[in-house]
Regions:
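Small-residue hotspots
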Residues: 108, 115-118, 122-125, 145, ...
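Active-site-adjacent bridging/hinge elements
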Residues: 127-136
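Hydrophobic, aromatic-enriched interface-forming segments
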Residues: 154-169
Length: 332
C-alpha cells in the first residue's frame, strides 16, 4: 500500500503587511508588479499609501510618528562620556579598581547603543524596496526584522553582564569568593563575575547595608530583564529563537517509540522558543529603560569623582584613602 501526502505551506507573515493605494489593497509583491517600472519608484509612492499591518491601518505619516515615538523611548546613556572619562588619568593612579570598573562602564554603554540600533531596525515594519526588493513579498523584510530583534536581545543580555562587571571590579567583590586566588590573571577573575556568584556574595554580606543598596540596584535590573535573559539563553545555548509567522507550520510530526507506546523522540522537541516579534518589542523597550536607570544608579553609587586626588603647592600628591569613599570594602 502506498501513501502520498501533499502539503502546501506558506508562512503567515506573507499576509502581515498590505499597502492601500488609490482605493486598492496590495501585498508587497503585488504592489511591486503593478507599479514598479524604474528604481526608487515604489519609495516615491509610499507616502501616498496607507499601511495595513496585522489588521491595523495607519497612514504613512502615522507610521513615521510611531517610529519617532520608539526612538524617544530609547534614551542614550552617556554616564561614561559625561562624568567618568575625564577622570581616567587620575583613576589609574588613585584607584586602579575604579579605573577597571570605568572601562566596563564604557563597554556597557557601547553595548547598549548597539542594542538600541538593532531594536529600532527590528521595530521598523517596512523596508525600502531599494534595500529589500518588494517583488519577493514581505517574508524577506520580516526575516530581516527577526534577525535584528534577536541581535538586540543578545546585546541587551550582554549589557547586564557588563553591569555586573562594573560593580564586581569597583569593589573587588571577587575577593569574597572561595574560588579566588591572589595570583589569578585578570581574565580568570572576570570569569568569576556571574549573577550566581553575586547571589552568594549577597548572602555572605547580608548585614552590609551598602551592599544591600548595590544589590537592589542590580536586582531591579535583573528582574526587568528576566524575559530578555531567557530569550538570550535560548539564542546562545539552546534551540535558538523562532518567530511566529516566519516559517509555515510543519504539517507533520514524527513520533518514534517502543511497541508499548512509549515515545522516544519527536520532531517538536527540537523546536526553538517561539516569540511574537511585535509583542517582544515593548519588552525590549522596557529593558532598555531599565538598563539606563541601572547604569545611572550604579554610577551614582560608586561615586568615581571621590577617587580624584589633588597636588599641593610642593608638587606632592594627596591621594584619598580608599576607606574614606569606597562604600563596599574588599575582603582581605
Amino acid at each position: 500500500m502506498n501513501f502520498t501526502f501533499t502539503s502546501r505551506t506558506v508562512p503567515d507573515c506573507e499576509q502581515y503587511l498590505q499597502l492601500v493605494y488609490q482605493g486598492r489593497q496590495f501585498l508587497l509583491d503585488e504592489f511591486s508588479e503593478a507599479f514598479k517600472t524604474q528604481p526608487y519608484q515604489l519609495e516615491q509612492l509610499l507616502p501616498d499609501c496607507s499601511i495595513i499591518y496585522r489588521g491595523t491601518t495607519m497612514t504613512f505619516d502615522e507610521y513615521k510618528a510611531s517610529r519617532v515615538a520608539i526612538s524617544n523611548q530609547l534614551n542614550l546613556s552617556r554616564q561614561y562620556s559625561n562624568s567618568v572619562v575625564s577622570l581616567e588619568p587620575m583613576l589609574t593612579i588613585s584607584n586602579f579598581d575604579y579605573y577597571k570598573s570605568a572601562k566596563f562602564l564604557e563597554k556597557a554603554e557601547a553595548c547598549l547603543q548597539s542594542a538600541r540600533i538593532y531594536l529600532m531596525h527590528g521595530a521598523n515594519i517596512i523596508e525600502f524596496d531599494c534595500n529589500v526588493p518588494w517583488e519577493y513579498g514581505y517574508l524577506p523584510i520580516f526575516g530581516l526584522r527577526t534577525i535584528n530583534l534577536t541581535t538586540a536581545i543578545i546585546w541587551y543580555n550582554n549589557c547586564f553582564d557588563h553591569i555586573l562587571q562594573i560593580a564586581f571590579l569597583a569593589f573587588e567583590l571577587y575577593r569574597d569568593l572561595k574560588d579566588f586566588k591572589h595570583d589569578m590573571a585578570f581574565e580568570d577573575i572576570l570569569r568569576l563575575c556571574s549573577y550566581s556568584n553575586f547571589t552568594k556574595i549577597h548572602k555572605k554580606r547580608s548585614n552590609d547595608t551598602n551592599f544591600s543598596e548595590l544589590w537592589t540596584i542590580i536586582e531591579d535590573c535583573h528582574t526587568a530583564l528576566s524575559n530578555i535573559n531567557i530569550w538570550a539563553n535560548y539564542a546562545k545555548h539552546k534551540g535558538g529563537i523562532g518567530y511566529i509567522g516566519l516559517k509555515p507550520e510543519c504539517p507533520y510530526q514524527i513520533f518514534v517509540g517502543e511497541p508499548d507506546g512509549k515515545i522516544e523522540a519527536r520532531t517538536s522537541e527540537f523546536e526553538p522558543i517561539r516569540l511574537d516579534a511585535d509583542q517582544c518589542i515593548p519588552e525590549l523597550v522596557s529593558g532598555h529603560q531599565a538598563i539606563c536607570d541601572c547604569i545611572s544608579a550604579l554610577v551614582d553609587f560608586i561615586e568615581y569623582p571621590k577617587a580624584n586626588y589633588t597636588i599641593d603647592e610642593n608638587g606632592r600628591f594627596d591621594i584619598p584613602e580608599k576607606s574614606t569613599y569606597v562604600k563596599i570594602q574588599a575582603q582581605q
